[in-house]
Every structure is written in structure tokens, then in C-alpha cells.
């Protein structure tokens, strides 16, 4: 397919500070109706960590995730590597933080798989050969090589979820943020997704209600409730704290 170039943005990776990919300090956010969705959130992710974000509906998980690449903007401090999230750095940070929505149909809007996966690199102003290379690499990473000319809306839910992940991997992010990746998948597709997430060599923050997924895949777990981080620690320890889990509407898998 022909590729139309956009104005280039910086393609330099975000430099880490003390090994931290993400630092959130005292983040507070209220919606226009006055509802306070986040209360003084503190969170840090080191390079290579895979962290589960859990909690009941309405805990603030999705609101927090929408702050990580500037879709929402609350009070407090948020840094990706050493860069503060602000208008000056927003393009670089959005390339460094790949956000994958729960519903892949919210992310796949182009006629073909190739065009969906090429969208991000194309809007970075990359040359055509690099765009094609990134698309091929991203599709290979998610086990979807050869699907470039397929129509995105004709794919199964499991395939769409993989393509959604490929759309952000083509940006070569330093942090992958996923919202409910296993939702709506049959057992085979869920197992395939778990294997994919395990094998991807990238820092990850994953919001999920799938506690079996948390136990299997994530060494660290962060629990949110009513807009606050109420626990942050080793998954095995937190999952054995039945009082804590019950208090915050969670069940041991």
C-alpha cells in the first residue's frame, strides 16, 4: 500500500532515571461533575517489571491508565523515564507508552491489518521502509505474520486483541499498558494471550479482573479501591491475604 508521510517527531527512546520506566507521584484527578476518581496516587515501575493492576469496578484503574500517556491530565507528577508528562514531551511519551484498550474495536479502525499496525509509525514520520519493517516485526511478535492484508473487522476476538497489541508494539514502546486483555476470550485464545504476554520482553502494567491470570503471570500486584492504591506488593503474598482481598471485592483464584 502507498504510505503518506507525516511531520516527523523525535524517535529517541526515553532515558530511564534510576531504572524507572514510570513514576507517578501524588496524582489526583476529578471528573467535570466533581467526582474524585484518583486520590494522591503513588506508583513506580522499573524496567522489565510486569505488574497487575486490580480492584473492583469503579476503583480508578482505567482512569489511572488514561493518565499514563496524557489522554487525561490530573494534578500531581507523572514521569516516563526522566521526562515529565507535559505538552512539550507528549509526542515522545505517547510513543514510549503503548496503551491497549479492552475492546479492540476501539483501536482497530483502518481497512486492513497492515494499515492499523502502520498507523503509529506512519504518524511519527518514519520512512516507508522502516514503517514496513516495524509492521512486520510487530505482527511477528504477536504471532500474526501474514495477516497484513486481512480485513481487521473480519478477525476473531483473539486475533483482534493480538493486532491491537501489535499496533502499539510497532511504536517500540518502553511500557505496555493493557486494559482487561483476557476479557471476552475463549479458553484457547486466553491461553494463547497469556503465552504472548509472558514472552514479550517489555515492561507491562495490566489492569484485569482475571485473578488466575494475575497469579500466573505477574510477580507484583497493585490493588486499587475508591481511587486509591490500597496495597502494592508481591502477588503471592497479597493473594494469600484473604481479609485484604475480601475487603476490596477480590477473590483468591
Task: Map each language-model feature to its residues.
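The feature captures the beta-strand-to-loop junction immediately N-terminal to the Walker
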Residues: 54-56
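Conserved ABC transporter NBD signature motif
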Residues: 74-85, 93
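Conserved ABC ATPase "signature" region
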Residues: 129-147
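Conserved ABC ATPase signature
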Residues: 151-155
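Catalytic Walker B motif of ABC-type/P-loop ATPase nucleotide-binding domains
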Residues: 176-179
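H-loop/switch region of ABC-family ATPase nucleotide-binding domains
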Residues: 208-209
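Conserved beta-strand-loop-alpha-helix hinge in the C-terminal portion
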Residues: 228-250
Amino acid at each position: 500500500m502507498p504510505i503518506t508521510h507525516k511531520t516527523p517527531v523525535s524517535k529517541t527512546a526515553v532515558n530511564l532515571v534510576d531504572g524507572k520506566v514510570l513514576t507517578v507521584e501524588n496524582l489526583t484527578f476529578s471528573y467535570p461533575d466533581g467526582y474524585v476518581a484518583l486520590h494522591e496516587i503513588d506508583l513506580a515501575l522499573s524496567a522489565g517489571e510486569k505488574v497487575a493492576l486490580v480492584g473492583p469496578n469503579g476503583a480508578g484503574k482505567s482512569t489511572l491508565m488514561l493518565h499514563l500517556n496524557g489522554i487525561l491530565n490530573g494534578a500531581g507528577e507523572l514521569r516516563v523515564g526522566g521526562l515529565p508528562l507535559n505538552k512539550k514531551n507528549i509526542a515522545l511519551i505517547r510513543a514510549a507508552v503503548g496503551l491497549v484498550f479492552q475492546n479492540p474495536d476501539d483501536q482497530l479502525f483502518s481497512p486492513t491489518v497492515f494499515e492499523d499496525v502502520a498507523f503509529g509509525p506512519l504518524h511519527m514520520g518514519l520512512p516507508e521502509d522502516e514503517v514496513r519493517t516495524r509492521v512486520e516485526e510487530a505482527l511477528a511478535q504477536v504471532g500474526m505474520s501474514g495477516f497484513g492484508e486481512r480485513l481487521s473487522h473480519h478477525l476473531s476476538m483473539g486475533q483482534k486483541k493480538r493486532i491491537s497489541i501489535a499496533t502499539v508494539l510497532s511504536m517500540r514502546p518502553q511500557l505496555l499498558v493493557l486494559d482487561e486483555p483476557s476479557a471476552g476470550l475463549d479458553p484457547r485464545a486466553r491461553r494463547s494471550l497469556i503465552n504472548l504476554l509472558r514472552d514479550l520482553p517489555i515492561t507491562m502494567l495490566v489492569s484485569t479482573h482475571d485473578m488466575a491470570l494475575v497469579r500466573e503471570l505477574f510477580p507484583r500486584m497493585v490493588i486499587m479501591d475508591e481511587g486509591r492504591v490500597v496495597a502494592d506488593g508481591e502477588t503471592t503474598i497479597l493473594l494469600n491475604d484473604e481479609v485484604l482481598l475480601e475487603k476490596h471485592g477480590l477473590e483468591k483464584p
